[in-house]
Amino acid sequence: QGKGLNEYTSLEEAISDLLRANGEAPTPDRKGFVSGKYGIAESNYQKLMRGDYDETHVLPDSHSFAKHTPEKTACFKSLLEHYPVRGKRIDGNARKEWDIKQRGITVLDPDAISPTITGHPDDYLHYCEPRIMTVRECARIQSFPDWYEIKKKYTTGGKMRKIEVPRYTQIGNAIPPLFAELAGIVLKRMI
């Protein structure tokens, strides 16, 4: 709808400017953590999501990296290098074979569209870096523009899930803004 976007945006087209390899700086709202810096916006989708936010901000909001143990990072690195299937959940026997303790994880496919974003950050392994996705990457996939600030804790667990709505959950439970806009346009035409 006049935004210069393709019908489909691959995962890489959506978030390749948010790689950890672009550099790090201390996370402003999360003591002891680091956030990623912007890389060059290459796709029309990245340019649309950034707007002019990156002209006034070096760090994307909520782009703080999880702290993985060396063992988990090694497992993730091995999966990226050797696991043959991208975009499908690793569970069952493959989970045991790769010594994955969590209920399952999906190694993301850079050339495909993203699977549904969930409120659980451990569900997805970044397509080229040995880490889980950041809140900002999930928000970008959901079409939240970079100027949109996400507040509260990054994650929570146990009984606190019933009373807190952390950032990953906010994004995973949200209606993607571009979808909402398009739905509004369609409804307006129907009236």
PLM features: residue spans?
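Flexible, glycine-/basic-rich loop-and-beta segments that form/coincide
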Residues: 1-32
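C-terminal target-recognition/interaction regions appended to catalytic cores
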Residues: 33-191
